[in-house]
Amino acid sequence: MEVVNALGRRKRAIARVFVSEGTGKITINKRDLAEYFPSTILQYVVKQPLNKLGAAEKYDIKVNLCGGGFTGQSQALRLAIARALIKMNAEDKAALRAEGFMTRDPRSVERKKPGQPKARRRFQFSKR
């Protein structure tokens, strides 16, 4: 039984995924998916690539998640799962790419600039 690993990132979140054949159990940092992500929306985001391929009950997934917030972590995990599924079966790549699961979202926080209170916000200007 082979174990396939993949990495996914989003904002400050990093997801390392280890996929093996099994019964559909997803374990995140030694906790169950429903325990780690109580929100059903985030659970749905994580399972999207599996549901698209109809592989929700085929694989056991172990995950190391660190950094970021809940939404960033769930999207990093979705990317990592999609990448791992392609390593398992390369023919699924077109279907996952069409749904946008293979694209790394490059948006992240813009840095704060000196002489300004935030990244884009300027200090209040006084004419007189």
From Swiss-Prot:
GO terms (BP aspect): translation
GO CC, alphabetical: cytosolic small ribosomal subunit
Pfam families: Ribosomal_S9 (PF00380)
Ranges for region Disordered: 105-128
Feature: compositional bias, Basic residues: 114-128
PROSITE patterns according to UniProt: RIBOSOMAL_S9
Keywords tagged on the record: Ribonucleoprotein, Ribosomal protein
Single Gene Ontology MF annotation: structural constituent of ribosome
SUPFAM superfamilies: Ribosomal protein S5 domain 2-like
Classification via HAMAP family: Ribosomal_uS9_B
Family: Belongs to the universal ribosomal protein uS9 family.
Protein name: Small ribosomal subunit protein uS9
Organism phylogeny: Bacteria, Pseudomonadati, Bacteroidota, Bacteroidia, Bacteroidales
